[in-house]
From Swiss-Prot:
This is ATP synthase subunit beta, chloroplastic. It comes from Hyacinthus orientalis. It is an enzyme of class 7 (translocase). InterPro entries: AAA+_ATPase (IPR003593), ATP-synt_VA_C (IPR055190), ATP_synth_F1_bsu (IPR005722), ATPase_a/bsu_AS (IPR020003), ATPase_alpha/beta_chains (IPR050053), ATPase_F1/V1/A1_a/bsu_N (IPR004100), ATPase_F1/V1/A1_a/bsu_N_sf (IPR036121), ATPase_F1/V1/A1_a/bsu_nucl-bd (IPR000194). ATP binds at residues 172-179. One of its GO terms (biological process) is proton motive force-driven mitochondrial ATP synthesis.
Length: 495
């Protein structure tokens, strides 16, 4: 483990030993720095610019070397705003990649991309640090055990179950509920899981980051009285940060998670909200670094950058990282290069649909578009697999009949099709569920539904035992018993 040059002031104090350069050019977040002949820094080395701006304000900007240009020049991307920097300013090559604090000292704290605490709770113990650039675990170190990760969310557990130690993507356009779903998963899993979690806020709203922090304090995931007993480390690089920070903050969070997996041999949860912003930040600096844009203006290195991050998120024989990533889908187009590249790395995809969200069905998970490699009879068992397939078939038939219903109406359908439509509408509503984190909006207390209860509920609907109940009885309830109780209440109100 190296000492982190960006958080330990003493490491940069002896300038004589340091390799010094000067700023030659500043283009937004990208700097060109000239070094003496034969003293070029390596790719990914951290450079520090210290000094004062024209008004006398202290400047301390950390950059990361991206390209060696020739003529003793390097091109670097700044991790914070470049306001106040001028040509000719002195730049110090730290001689190492960016390193961040890791281990128990990170729990209960909020960090920026450089691993500096931003929660005003004092300094963090930086004796154990780790560089943010590492290679993925070797092939022989990987673990291949298959087991289900129960979330307590009906639609997920039944139709697209998550793999323990796998990678899960939540896909959706703007405002369909990705962050709320991630917060519910943190609430359900991080509390029940008992292990440690790392949350990487990549280019999302600062307000949401603050809400999450407050919620974690309320729920006890972050223990205010004894920070060391907290279960989560938070790393934020929000929308207002320069692209350099948004491009690297995911790696900072991942580095902290890797330490818990490799050294502490724990099972870790890694939440990333939002992985699309990682790609977006890369495309923002790509043109400034002189690369030719690829499809839809993305960086030509898109799949390489995504691969180098995703391949590190894996389960080894020491421990596992289960990663849940929100993926923003630009203009609801799943064929856009950013979500399309992400798809290739995932074990399960939970696709959020604007159509369901418009109907008021939350979580707005599309039961036909969402997929999982775990939905196989040998993994989940025959009963679960059969129920999931029958639910999908019923919903698919309903989808096919919708055009006929729109033109001719329900009365023109055969008796069998009318029954299918009635059951599909009940299933659609029963797939909705009140969330703990959304109690404020829905007014209904949150519900956690175990997998066995979920399967039983859908089997009862499919068998026809509940054909006599009104479909609104199935909307925003937990298990099937709540739906029957709600139906009785509705009957009572009618009388």
């Amino acid at each position: 483990m190296r000492i982190n040059p960006t958080t330990s002031g003493s490491t940069v104090s002896t300038l004589e030993e340091k390799n010094l350069g000067r700023i030659a050019q500043i283009i937004g977040p990208v700097l060109d720095v000239v070094f003496p002949p034969g003293k070029m820094p390596n790719i990914y080395n951290a450079l520090v610019v210290k000094g004062r701006d024209t008004v006398g304000q202290q400047i301390n900007v950390t950059c990361e070397v991206q390209q060696l240009l020739g003529n003793n020049r390097v091109r670097a991307v700044a991790m914070s705003a470049t306001d106040g920097l001028t040509r000719g300013m002195e730049v110090i090559d730290t001689g190492a990649a960016l390193s961040v604090p890791v281990g128990g000292a990170t729990l209960g704290r909020i960090f920026n991309v450089l691993g500096e605490p931003v929660d005003n709770l004092g300094p963090v113990d930086t004796r154990t640090t780790s560089p943010i650039h590492r290679s993925a675990p070797a092939f022989i170190q990987l673990d291949t055990k298959l087991s289900i990760f129960e979330t307590g969310i009906k639609v997920v557990d039944l139709l697209a179950p998550y793999r323990r130690g796998g990678k899960i993507g939540l896909f959706g356009g703007a405002g369909v509920g990705k962050t709320v779903l991630i917060m519910e998963l943190i609430n359900n899993i991080a509390k029940a899981h008992g292990g440690v979690s790392v949350f990487g806020g990549v280019g999302e709203r600062t307000r949401e980051g603050n809400d999450l922090y407050m919620e974690m304090k309320e729920s006890g995931v972050i223990n205010e009285k004894n920070i060391a007993e907290s279960k989560v480390a938070l790393v934020y690089g929000q929308m207002n940060e320069p692209p350099g920070a948004r491009m690297r903050v995911g790696l900072t969070a991942l580095t902290m998670a890797e330490y818990f997996r490799d050294v502490n041999e724990q099972d870790v949860l890694l939440f990333i909200d939002n992985i699309f912003r990682f790609v977006q930040a890369g495309s923002e600096v790509s043109a400034l670094l002189g690369r030719m844009p690829s499809a839809v203006g993305y960086q030509p290195t898109l799949s390489t950058e995504m691969g180098s991050l995703q391949e590190r998120i894996t389960s080894t024989k020491e421990g596992s990282i289960t990663s849940i990533q929100a993926v923003y889908v630009p203009a609801d187009d799943l064929t856009d290069p950013a979500p399309a590249t992400t798809f290739a790395h995932l074990d399960a995809t939970t696709v959020l649909s604007r159509g369901l969200s418009a109907k008021g069905i939350y979580p707005a998970v599309d039961p036909l578009d969402s997929t999982s490699t775990m939905l196989q009879p040998r993994i989940v068992g025959e009963e679960h697999y059969e129920t999931a397939q029958r639910v999908k078939q019923t919903l698919q038939r309903y989808k096919e009949l919708q055009d006929i219903i729109a033109i001719l109406g329900l009365d023109e359908l055969s008796e069998e099709d009318r029954l299918t439509v009635a059951r599909a509408r009940k299933i659609e509503r029963f797939l909705s569920q009140p969330f703990f984190v959304a109690e404020v909006f829905t007014g209904s207390p949150g519900k956690y539904v175990g997998l066995a209860e979920t399967i039983r509920g859908f089997q009862l609907i499919l068998s026809g035992e509940l054909d006599g109940l009104p479909e609104q009885a199935f909307y925003l309830v937990g298990n099937i018993d709540e739906a029957t109780a709600k139906a009785m209440n509705l009957e009572g109100e009618k009388k």
